[in-house]
A protein has these predicted regions:
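Short beta-strand segments
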Residues: 75, 103, 136-138, 161, ...
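A glycine/threonine-rich phosphate-anchoring loop and its flanking beta-alpha core
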Residues: 40, 151-215
Length: 215
């Protein structure tokens, strides 16, 4: 037992700690090790506001917005898919990127753990691993779900928000808040995850229902 204890002390002889460990050993019977993790993280990102930003997204990705990633998962809902997700998919394909569109039924009712799991399984089936980037194309439900998926998929992959609603532009797509709802709580299961960039395409507002404009 004594030899094993000495072996552990020698192996984990971090700077200046061995003597303190021996003192603690005498007091409590076993040494304690302290792990210090100090880092500075810059989560800054750009918000671009304009008209018809699909070409700009493609240009930014070509210039390394998502690093060396060339595989993009476009997450969207059934309403936004034909309007904006498919044109973006086509543009990225023209630029040589590998893209797939992952769709869920539009509406707040889809903001669930079940939808998140469905999206993750669909990405796995398509061969997506850690070397990918997620593009959220849609309103608040889309950006919430896509950002949450990005934060956990492969222990974290980059993502970009392409907001197509006023709510997403003003709140959901910025600030890094991502979450899903459950029968017991709203927006309580989630995480803070900052995007690489946010695009606010004002042209997308032309297709919004009037009730959303005035609300």
């Amino acid at each position: 037992m004594i030899k094993m204890q000495e072996h552990l002390e020698n192996r984990f002889d971090f700077t200046g700690q061995r003597q303190r460990e021996r003192q603690r050993e005498g007091e409590k019977g076993m040494p304690k090790l302290e792990v210090e993790l100090k880092r500075v993280v810059d989560d800054s990102y750009e918000i671009e506001i304009g008209h018809g930003l699909v070409d700009q997204v493609a240009a930014d990705l070509k210039h390394g917005l998502a690093g060396k990633v060339h595989k993009f998962a476009i997450i969207t809902d059934s309403n936004v898919e034909p309007l904006y997700a498919r044109p973006l998919e086509q543009k990225l394909a023209e630029e040589g990127f590998q893209t797939d569109v992952f769709i869920f039924p539009a509406g707040e009712k889809s903001k669930t753990r079940q939808t998140k799991a469905m999206l993750e399984d669909a990405m796995l089936e398509k061969g997506y691993r850690r070397d990918c980037c997620i593009l959220a194309v849609g309103g608040g439900v889309v950006t919430d779900l896509a950002g949450f998926v990005a934060g956990t998929y492969g222990r974290g992959v980059p993502f970009i928000n392409y907001a197509t609603s006023l709510l997403a532009a003003a709140d959901a797509s910025v600030g890094g808040k991502t979450a899903v709802d459950t029968p017991l709580a709203t927006n309580l299961i989630g995480l803070i995850n900052q995007p690489q960039k946010v695009y606010l395409d004002l042209d997308t507002w032309k297709t919004l229902p009037e009730r959303e404009i005035y609300s």
